[in-house]
């Protein structure tokens, strides 16, 4: 991916606030959230809609969202019909994979300017049944599309939470260690919110209700005042035989939100007199055993950092998606990461995990955090249901 003297750069990055399940953003169609962030990143980059070559978004729970929701989001943002738009599906990694695909398209010369990102409204995900051939007798069971299409491992037919329990057991991550990761995430997110660290990256979403328009611009999911004592009282959710360690508090949530970035070559940014947020140095993806899908970022990060010609010690900040605290602890342990460099403003346990959006959300947060603290090198990475990981290295300056 390293493009030498004319690398692919990111010139703008924004996200919506993250809504709780059935919360502030639950009534907003997913393509409208996509439209909101596309409009914002184009405006920040001073790029006219007709100058865009392509739009690529990660989106996982597409059932009932209408034909090609990314195309709907693109057109809604004023991008003309002549500009193609499409979505990619890599579960939790979708939003970052979309950015990788955009960078590839530009590096290959197929595109000049690409808007990439991700979006998800988990609150609107429907329940499903198959009635195509009719039902002669009896009840018709409904399947939750969040579970069957997003959170259930297709190879072992169990919930992602069980994969976290598998990681906790194999990497010897105790319940207390998981709760400490979760409390740290919540406390960091609380501090970041109160200090205004997310203000620059968030674009408000206008939500219609009987009371009129409401502006949603603050992440809804964090639980301020979180502490170990309260968290320790929760019972394990996925294994209830006395061996479980994963609880609702040390796992990420089900959430709604969208994020986007604008990419172009460095020379194009210079021509437009734009100062890039960062250049994309490398990216990588890897596969692991699906039963321990959460450790996918370990090989992905190692490979991406090696491609960049860096060592792990060279990296100033990591944004690694907190699908589960057990997973976060195992990754940090295996890679020997300094906790002061990882998710310094909290992660998905506190902020939430809108499936298709999270990959780009963590990249947006990484870019703005690097800028705020004066860091140079950053890594964004996610584990992926089904046993995969994806990682990207970016560099400022």
From Swiss-Prot:
Pathway: Lipid metabolism; fatty acid metabolism. The modification N-acetylmethionine is found at residue 1. Keywords: Acetylation, Acyltransferase, Cytoplasm, Transferase. The active site is at 92 (acyl-thioester intermediate), 383 (proton donor/acceptor). CoA binds at residues 223, 226, 252. One of its GO terms (cellular component) is mitochondrion. The modification N6-acetyllysine is found at residues 200, 233, 235. The keyword Acetylation applies. Signal peptide: none annotated. It holds the Pfam family Thiolase_C. One of its GO terms (molecular function) is acetyl-CoA C-acetyltransferase activity. The record marks 353 as: Increases nucleophilicity of active site Cys. GO terms for biological process: fatty acid metabolic process; positive regulation of intestinal cholesterol absorption. It catalyses: 2 acetyl-CoA = acetoacetyl-CoA + CoA. Its main location: cytoplasm. Belongs to the thiolase-like superfamily. Thiolase family. This is Acetyl-CoA acetyltransferase, cytosolic. It comes from Mus musculus.
């Amino acid at each position: 991916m390293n493009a030498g003297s004319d690398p692919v750069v990111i010139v703008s990055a924004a996200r919506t606030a993250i809504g709780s399940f059935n919360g502030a953003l639950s009534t907003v169609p997913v393509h409208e959230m996509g439209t909101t962030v596309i409009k914002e990143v184009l405006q920040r980059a001073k790029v006219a809609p007709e100058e865009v070559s392509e739009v690529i978004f990660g989106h996982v729970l597409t059932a009932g969202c209408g034909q090609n929701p990314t195309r709907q989001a693109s057109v809604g943002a004023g991008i003309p019909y002549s500009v193609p738009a499409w979505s990619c599906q890599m579960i939790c990694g979708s939003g970052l994979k979309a950015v990788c695909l955009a960078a590839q398209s530009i590096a290959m010369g197929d595109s000049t300017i690409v808007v990439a990102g991700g979006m998800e409204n988990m609150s609107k995900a429907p329940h499903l049944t198959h009635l195509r051939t009719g039902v002669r007798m009896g009840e018709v069971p409904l399947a939750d599309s969040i579970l069957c299409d997003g959170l259930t491992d297709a190879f072992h037919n169990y919930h992602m939470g069980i994969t976290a329990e598998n990681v906790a057991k194999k990497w010897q991550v105790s319940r207390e260690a998981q709760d400490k990761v979760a409390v740290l995430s919540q406390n960091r997110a609380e501090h970041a919110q109160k200090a205004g660290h997310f203000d620059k990256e968030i674009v408000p979403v206008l939500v219609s209700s009987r009371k009129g328009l409401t502006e949603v611009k603050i992440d809804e999911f964090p639980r301020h005042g979180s502490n170990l004592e309260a968290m320790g009282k929760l019972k394990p959710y996925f294994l209830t035989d006395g061996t479980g360690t994963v609880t609702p508090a040390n796992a990420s949530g089900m959430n709604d939100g969208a994020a986007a970035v604008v990419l172009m070559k460095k020379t194009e940014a210079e021509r437009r007199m734009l100062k890039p947020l960062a250049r994309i140095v490398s990216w990588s993806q890897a596969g692991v055993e699906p039963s321990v899908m959460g450790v996918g970022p370990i090989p992905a990060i190692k490979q991406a950092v090696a491609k960049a010609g860096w060592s792990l010690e060279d990296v100033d900040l990591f944004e690694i998606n907190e699908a589960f605290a057990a997973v976060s602890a195992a990754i940090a342990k295996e890679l020997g990461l300094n906790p002061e460099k990882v998710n310094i403003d909290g992660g998905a346990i506190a902020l939430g995990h809108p499936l298709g959006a999270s990959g780009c959300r963590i990249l947006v947060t990484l870019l703005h955090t690097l800028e705020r603290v004066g860091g140079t090198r950053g890594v964004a990475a996610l584990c992926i249901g089904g046993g995969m990981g994806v990682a990207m290295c970016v560099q400022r300056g």
